[in-house]
């Protein structure tokens, strides 16, 4: 019986119609109703979480509730809204994570734990790649991928390792056109968060690199506060020091690797990094901190303002003080930038892309898609899906919508953990998941 199994029992490798809109839902879930868990998920269901909706810290215990990963059954498929078609595009990959599509349509896949980047080639409209090659290997936990300069004929593929950035000469082929070059020899590494993402600003003058925090909540920083207090003014607003120096931040470099500053601070773990194609705004998809209960702290997706401070570790979602750092940085109160879109806490928001294709209905153009890897620090499982980020006139509304679900089997078992999202050359949406090593293609 499949009544409560979201990976529906389907006999083919294709879902043609998808699922209808959230039982006729016309208004988004708000307040406590928006927190929910995986059982409430449904393609088309919308949520809005506001800062005023947040509970007090410690209202529920902090729990360890790791998922049990199982193999994907042949008839287990993700589901999208009605009118969309879901197909298995590629399988047998080694933990595929970030996805990036080159101007010629080639699909670059970071196989992070295998230390390599793979490239898949598929003609427009094809449901399977016609070529599958290793583009680069021997890398150190690669994640972010970017093409430079912008336009139809980039000359370089930049790859962010966990401890630096390299670039490969590129002529649109399935392999580099020359030897790699080290661009940033050293990035902060070690600790809890190893992903490094990168994008170029719309004018191609700066390369932005996101660096996650070393720890959950800067647990060791309190011991250094006395020594560092006189130094805060010498650093960017809200910058972390000590073992967290240049962590929980977006750093800025010139394309040749010369460091030119810190773009933003206090972003605990900006895994997804994307530039909106119309506005040019830089966005982060962010994993927030653990240990404060089921519904704290919300993950978020936000525009990243240059020079802004987003709270970590002292504050969260505006002026809410983390009780584990009470009284440490009162000087920062009132200086925190509140994120744009709050997501169910512990969802583990990862890859981010803005829809720029022509295949989906017109109302999707310019909206975002974000992969939710799934919770472990929540008693009721959440995440394990792809969400649509709603924008209006180029600005985030705070609303997000379940778009692709079906990776959870029951309260303890999951077969898929979404990581990367990308728009294919023909306008299809591509989604990677690293539990069973698959990439899915969603068309309309």
Model-predicted regions and their roles:
Residues 92, 96-100, 116-150:
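Blade-loop segments of beta-propeller domains
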Residues 78, 104-129, 173:
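Beta-propeller domains
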Residues 85, 95, 103, 113, ...:
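Beta-rich catalytic cores
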Residues 27-81, 154, 195, 213-261, ...:
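Beta-propeller domain segments
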Residues 107-109, 155-159, 206-209, 282-284, ...:
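Hydrophobic beta-strand segments that make up the repeating blades of beta-propeller
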Residues 132, 136, 141-148, 155, ...:
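Asp-box/WD-like beta-propeller blade repeats and closely related beta-sheet repeat scaffolds
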């Amino acid at each position: 019986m499949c009544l409560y199994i979201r990976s529906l029992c389907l006999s083919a490798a294709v879902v043609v119609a998808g699922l209808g809109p959230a039982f006729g839902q016309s208004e988004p879930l708000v307040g406590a109703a928006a927190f929910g868990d995986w059982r409430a998920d449904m393609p088309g269901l919308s949520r809005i979480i506001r800062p005023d909706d947040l509970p007090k810290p410690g209202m529920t215990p902090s729990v360890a509730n790791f998922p049990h990963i199982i193999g994907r059954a042949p008839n287990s498929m993700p589901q999208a809204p009605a009118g969309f078609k879901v197909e298995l595009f590629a399988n047998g990959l080694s933990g595929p994570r970030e996805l990036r599509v080159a101007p010629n349509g080639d699909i670059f896949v970071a196989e992070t734990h295998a230390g390599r980047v793979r490239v898949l080639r598929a003609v427009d409209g094809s449901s399977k790649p016609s070529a599958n090659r290793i583009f680069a290997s021997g890398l150190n936990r690669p994640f972010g991928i970017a093409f430079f300069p912008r336009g139809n004929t980039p000359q370089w593929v930049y790859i962010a390792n966990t401890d630096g950035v390299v670039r490969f000469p590129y002529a649109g082929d399935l392999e580099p056109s020359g030897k790699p070059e080290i661009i940033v020899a050293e990035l902060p590494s070690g600790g809890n968060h190893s992903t490094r993402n990168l994008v170029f600003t719309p004018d191609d003058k700066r390369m932005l690199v996101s660096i996650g925090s070393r720890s959950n909540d800067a647990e060791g920083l309190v011991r250094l506060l006395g020594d560092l207090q006189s130094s805060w003014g010498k650093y960017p607003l809200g910058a972390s020091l000590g073992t967290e120096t240049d962590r929980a931040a977006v750093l800025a470099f010139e394309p040749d690797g010369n460091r030119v500053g810190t773009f933003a601070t206090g972003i605990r773990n900006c895994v997804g990094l994307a530039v909106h194609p119309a506005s040019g705004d830089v966005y982060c998809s962010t994993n927030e901190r653990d240990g404060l209960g089921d519904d704290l702290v919300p993950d978020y997706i936000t525009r990243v303002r240059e020079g802004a401070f987003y709270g970590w570790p002292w504050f969260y979602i505006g002026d809410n003080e983390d009780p584990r750092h009470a009284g440490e940085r009162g000087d920062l109160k009132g200086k925190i930038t509140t994120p744009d879109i709050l997501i169910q806490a512990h969802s583990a928001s990862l890859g981010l892309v803005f829809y720029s294709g022509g295949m989906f209905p017109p109302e999707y153009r310019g909206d975002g898609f974000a992969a939710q890897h799934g919770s472990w620090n929540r008693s009721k499982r959440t995440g394990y899906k792809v969400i649509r980020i709603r924008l209006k006139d180029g600005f985030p509304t705070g609303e997000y919508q379940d778009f692709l679900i079906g990776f959870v089997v029951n309260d303890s078992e999951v077969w898929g953990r979404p990581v990367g999202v990308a728009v294919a050359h023909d306008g299809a949406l591509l989604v990677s998941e690293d539990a069973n090593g698959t990439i899915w293609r969603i068309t309309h």
